[in-house]
Protein backbone atom coordinates (compact mmCIF):
# COMPACT_ATOMS: atom_id res chain seq x y z
CA UNK A 1 0.00 0.00 0.00
CA UNK A 2 1.46 3.38 -0.99
CA UNK A 3 -0.37 5.43 1.66
CA UNK A 4 0.66 5.52 5.30
CA UNK A 5 -1.98 5.97 7.98
CA UNK A 6 -1.39 7.21 11.50
CA UNK A 7 -2.65 4.42 13.72
CA UNK A 8 -3.46 6.62 16.70
CA UNK A 9 -3.44 10.22 17.83
CA UNK A 10 -2.93 8.90 21.37
CA UNK A 11 0.85 9.11 21.06
CA UNK A 12 2.97 11.25 23.34
CA UNK A 13 6.70 11.88 23.59
CA UNK A 14 9.19 13.78 25.71
CA UNK A 15 11.38 16.24 23.86
CA UNK A 16 13.98 18.89 24.65
CA UNK A 17 14.54 22.18 22.85
CA UNK A 18 17.87 23.11 21.36
CA UNK A 19 18.02 26.61 22.89
CA UNK A 20 18.15 25.01 26.37
CA UNK A 21 21.60 25.72 27.86
CA UNK A 22 21.69 22.06 28.95
CA UNK A 23 21.57 20.95 25.30
CA UNK A 24 24.68 21.23 23.15
CA UNK A 25 24.45 20.52 19.42
CA UNK A 26 25.63 21.65 16.02
CA UNK A 27 23.28 23.01 13.36
CA UNK A 28 23.41 19.62 11.60
CA UNK A 29 22.57 17.77 14.83
CA UNK A 30 19.71 20.20 15.52
CA UNK A 31 18.28 19.62 12.04
CA UNK A 32 18.57 15.84 12.39
CA UNK A 33 16.89 15.94 15.81
CA UNK A 34 13.98 18.07 14.60
CA UNK A 35 13.44 15.59 11.77
CA UNK A 36 13.72 12.45 13.89
CA UNK A 37 12.87 13.37 17.48
CA UNK A 38 15.68 11.00 18.51
CA UNK A 39 17.74 12.48 21.37
CA UNK A 40 20.70 10.44 20.12
CA UNK A 41 20.86 12.82 17.15
CA UNK A 42 21.82 15.67 19.49
CA UNK A 43 25.34 16.31 20.77
CA UNK A 44 24.97 16.40 24.55
CA UNK A 45 21.74 16.50 26.54
CA UNK A 46 22.39 16.99 30.25
CA UNK A 47 20.04 15.63 32.91
CA UNK A 48 19.11 19.22 33.76
CA UNK A 49 17.59 19.80 30.29
CA UNK A 50 13.93 20.79 30.44
CA UNK A 51 11.69 18.02 29.09
CA UNK A 52 8.45 18.86 27.32
CA UNK A 53 5.75 16.21 26.91
CA UNK A 54 3.62 16.62 23.82
CA UNK A 55 0.89 14.48 22.32
CA UNK A 56 0.04 13.89 18.69
CA UNK A 57 -2.90 15.82 17.27
CA UNK A 58 -5.54 14.14 15.15
CA UNK A 59 -6.39 15.64 11.74
CA UNK A 60 -9.56 17.16 13.20
CA UNK A 61 -7.61 18.70 16.11
CA UNK A 62 -5.12 20.24 13.67
CA UNK A 63 -7.97 21.60 11.55
CA UNK A 64 -9.72 23.02 14.63
CA UNK A 65 -6.48 24.79 15.61
CA UNK A 66 -6.31 26.39 12.17
CA UNK A 67 -9.95 27.47 12.33
CA UNK A 68 -9.54 28.97 15.83
CA UNK A 69 -6.49 30.84 14.55
CA UNK A 70 -8.53 32.37 11.71
CA UNK A 71 -8.12 30.04 8.72
CA UNK A 72 -11.25 31.39 7.05
CA UNK A 73 -10.26 35.03 7.43
CA UNK A 74 -6.50 34.85 6.82
CA UNK A 75 -4.94 36.83 4.00
CA UNK A 76 -4.63 34.72 0.86
CA UNK A 77 -2.35 37.35 -0.66
CA UNK A 78 -0.19 37.08 2.46
CA UNK A 79 -0.13 33.27 2.11
CA UNK A 80 0.97 33.51 -1.52
CA UNK A 81 3.65 36.08 -0.69
CA UNK A 82 4.86 33.90 2.20
CA UNK A 83 5.21 30.88 -0.10
CA UNK A 84 6.88 32.85 -2.88
CA UNK A 85 9.30 34.82 -0.67
CA UNK A 86 13.01 34.20 -1.33
CA UNK A 87 14.97 32.17 1.21
CA UNK A 88 18.24 34.12 1.25
CA UNK A 89 18.43 36.79 3.96
CA UNK A 90 19.62 39.68 1.79
CA UNK A 91 17.50 38.66 -1.17
CA UNK A 92 14.44 38.41 1.08
CA UNK A 93 15.15 41.82 2.63
CA UNK A 94 15.36 43.47 -0.81
CA UNK A 95 12.26 41.61 -1.99
CA UNK A 96 10.32 42.66 1.12
CA UNK A 97 11.47 46.27 0.72
CA UNK A 98 10.02 46.31 -2.81
CA UNK A 99 6.56 45.16 -1.67
CA UNK A 100 3.70 47.64 -1.68
CA UNK A 101 2.22 48.73 1.65
CA UNK A 102 -0.82 46.50 0.99
CA UNK A 103 1.43 43.51 0.30
CA UNK A 104 3.46 44.12 3.46
CA UNK A 105 0.25 44.35 5.48
CA UNK A 106 -1.04 41.11 3.91
CA UNK A 107 2.22 39.33 4.68
CA UNK A 108 2.25 40.60 8.27
CA UNK A 109 -1.35 39.44 8.70
CA UNK A 110 -0.44 35.98 7.40
CA UNK A 111 2.60 35.75 9.70
CA UNK A 112 0.36 36.69 12.64
CA UNK A 113 -2.08 33.95 11.55
CA UNK A 114 0.77 31.39 11.51
CA UNK A 115 1.79 32.45 15.03
CA UNK A 116 -1.80 31.92 16.20
CA UNK A 117 -1.90 28.47 14.55
CA UNK A 118 1.33 27.49 16.31
CA UNK A 119 -0.02 28.69 19.66
CA UNK A 120 -3.24 26.70 19.15
CA UNK A 121 -1.28 23.57 18.21
CA UNK A 122 0.87 23.88 21.33
CA UNK A 123 -2.24 24.62 23.42
CA UNK A 124 -3.76 21.31 22.27
CA UNK A 125 -0.59 19.22 22.38
CA UNK A 126 1.59 20.30 25.32
CA UNK A 127 0.76 18.27 28.42
CA UNK A 128 3.78 18.59 30.74
CA UNK A 129 6.96 20.57 31.30
CA UNK A 130 9.51 18.90 33.57
CA UNK A 131 6.94 16.27 34.54
CA UNK A 132 4.41 18.85 35.77
CA UNK A 133 1.12 19.71 34.02
CA UNK A 134 1.70 22.59 31.61
CA UNK A 135 0.01 24.98 29.21
CA UNK A 136 0.94 27.27 26.34
CA UNK A 137 0.71 30.17 28.79
CA UNK A 138 3.93 28.94 30.40
CA UNK A 139 5.67 28.97 27.03
CA UNK A 140 4.65 32.61 26.60
CA UNK A 141 6.59 33.45 29.78
CA UNK A 142 9.93 32.19 28.44
CA UNK A 143 12.58 34.89 28.17
CA UNK A 144 14.43 36.07 26.20
CA UNK A 145 11.91 36.32 23.38
CA UNK A 146 14.29 34.60 20.97
CA UNK A 147 14.21 31.49 23.16
CA UNK A 148 10.40 31.65 23.41
CA UNK A 149 10.13 31.78 19.62
CA UNK A 150 12.58 28.89 19.24
CA UNK A 151 10.67 26.81 21.80
CA UNK A 152 7.37 27.43 19.97
CA UNK A 153 8.88 26.60 16.58
CA UNK A 154 10.55 23.42 17.82
CA UNK A 155 7.46 22.25 19.70
CA UNK A 156 5.40 22.74 16.54
CA UNK A 157 7.97 20.86 14.44
CA UNK A 158 7.78 17.88 16.83
CA UNK A 159 3.97 18.09 17.06
CA UNK A 160 3.64 18.05 13.28
CA UNK A 161 6.11 15.18 12.93
CA UNK A 162 4.46 12.88 15.46
CA UNK A 163 0.96 13.87 14.33
CA UNK A 164 1.69 13.08 10.69
CA UNK A 165 4.33 10.35 10.89
CA UNK A 166 3.97 8.82 14.34
CA UNK A 167 6.74 8.48 16.91
CA UNK A 168 9.08 6.59 14.58
CA UNK A 169 9.09 9.51 12.13
CA UNK A 170 10.21 9.09 8.55
Regions found by a protein language model. Give the residues of each.
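Charged, composition-biased interaction segments
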Residues: 19-23
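Short, intrinsically disordered N-terminal pre-domain segments
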Residues: 1-13
